[in-house]
Amino acid sequence: MAPPKAEKKPASKAPAEKKPAAKKTASATDSKKRTKTRKETYSSYIYKVLKQTHPDTGISQKAMSIMNSFVNDIFERIASEASKLAAYNKKSTISAREIQTAVRLILPGELAKHAVSEGTRAVTKYSSASN
């Protein structure tokens, strides 16, 4: 047990000399831990859409949480259905067609029509911007 104690003392002395560097790495690891625990949400996008439609209306944290859960749920349903459609057609890639069909299957009537038209418009805008 004496040799490990002797080894620990010189090791603790060496980092003591490099404390400023150790603090930087410690703060870097702390910030990395914070980024790992950070939860990604659609809050900023929901807020932007709210301000486009109702500029003088706000939203509470609870309502924002509900909206975020709603968006996550719809996203999960569409992705799951699109995945099934790709599997049925023996394809390993989900394309815009699978997403469009999944939206038509999941959303009811007029809502599906509007979603498909808005999605098509967004894809067209993205394609023209990237060229």
UniProtKB/Swiss-Prot annotation:
Residues 1-39 are annotated as: Disordered. SMART domains: H2B. Signal peptide: none annotated. Keywords: Acetylation, Chromosome, DNA-binding, Isopeptide bond, Nucleosome core, Nucleus, Phosphoprotein, Ubl conjugation. Core component of nucleosome. Nucleosomes wrap and compact DNA into chromatin, limiting DNA accessibility to the cellular machineries which require DNA as a template. Histones thereby play a central role in transcription regulation, DNA repair, DNA replication and chromosomal stability. DNA accessibility is regulated via a complex set of post-translational modifications of histones, also called histone code, and nucleosome remodeling. The nucleosome is a histone octamer containing two molecules each of H2A, H2B, H3 and H4 assembled in one H3-H4 heterotetramer and two H2A-H2B heterodimers. The octamer wraps approximately 147 bp of DNA. This is Histone H2B.1. It comes from Scheffersomyces stipitis (strain ATCC 58785 / CBS 6054 / NBRC 10063 / NRRL Y-11545).
